[in-house]
Design a protein with these regions (language model features):
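Well-ordered beta-sheet/strand-loop patches within structured domains
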Residues: 3, 12-33, 38-277
């Protein structure tokens, strides 16, 4: 049978290594951070609760503890100013401005307005960001899907690619005035289009020469909703968070009316003394 010889072992005890509270604090401490909407994804980035503790207090608690006793170090929690729940509850909850206009004209014009409205719909602007109509719904080419329809050029009504899109830019301008947003760039038409209920609320755009731009001067993100319904009525609404209660209501006043005059120009194909029928 196997034989066993006794083994002598010397047992020594030693105090545990003192914890490095500064190192622990550097691992667990966090600054509070507000929730926000990501610029690229347009999704909510959750808020962060601030975490910290007093290293001197932690050392004092440890020094006062008996052997084998479990100690707890109190954490200092700091809530951010804008939590995830608060942002979700306030995001796009208010109508800052809304307006509708009726679209007339041939089917190509309706088609262009509908296409532009679909490209505009769902646009989100963060606080301080500037919106560009041309960058959002352009380019105004056949290759990008637009068709030829009536528009004003050089004082005349002609067919041109993307004709009709100015009704959407005008409708949007009208709504931004209601929402009290900051207008950065806006150009009026040579003639009153007739589709805007208030004279002076139109906004013409074209290629890279004329744009309609405005800035989100609120403290929260804003979102644009736009669509053309089956009755050819164009709807534009801007959603956001109303923190001021200040809104605009554009109107016009007719001060005077200037009668028009006929201007006659000779044309070789028409006999002298006659007018075209």
């Amino acid at each position: 049978p196997a034989s066993y010889a006794p083994i002598e072992a010397q047992v020594t005890t030693a105090p545990p290594a003192a914890p490095d509270f500064d190192a622990i604090r550097s691992e667990v401490a966090a600054e509070p951070a507000d929730a926000y909407l990501d610029k690229e994804t347009r999704e909510i980035v959750p808020s962060v609760t601030g975490v910290d503790f007093d290293t001197a207090q932690a050392q004092a608690v440890l020094d006062a503890a008996g052997e084998g006793e479990t100690v707890s170090v109190p954490l200092l929690l700091t809530e951010p100013k804008l939590t995830t729940a608060k942002l979700e509850a306030n995001l796009f909850k208010d109508v800052l401005g809304s307006g509708s206009t009726t679209c007339a004209g041939p089917s190509n014009r309706w088609y262009n307005i509908d296409l532009a409205a679909k490209r505009l719909n769902g646009t989100i602007l963060l606080p301080g960001e500037t919106f560009s109509y041309n960058d959002t719904v352009g380019p105004y080419t056949l290759a990008s899907g637009y068709k030829a329809a009536g528009t004003y050029q050089n004082g005349q009504s002609v067919d041109a690619t993307a004709g009709g899109i100015c009704q959407l830019s005008s409708n949007l301008y009208w709504v931004t005035l209601k929402a009290n947003l900051e207008i950065v760039e806006r150009h009026k038409h040579q003639f009153n289009g007739g589709y805007m209920p208030v004279i002076g609320t139109d906004a013409t755009v074209w290629s890279d020469q004329l744009d309609f731009r405005f800035q989100n001067n609120t403290d929260y993100p804003i979102k644009i909703e736009s669509y053309l319904d089956k009755n050819h009525k164009l709807h534009v609404t801007i959603y956001g968070t109303d923190t001021t209660g200040i809104h605009g209501e554009p109107y016009h006043v007719v001060i005077s009316t200037v009668p028009y005059k006929n201007t006659y120009q000779p044309k070789d194909s028409i006999p002298v003394g006659t007018e075209p029928q």
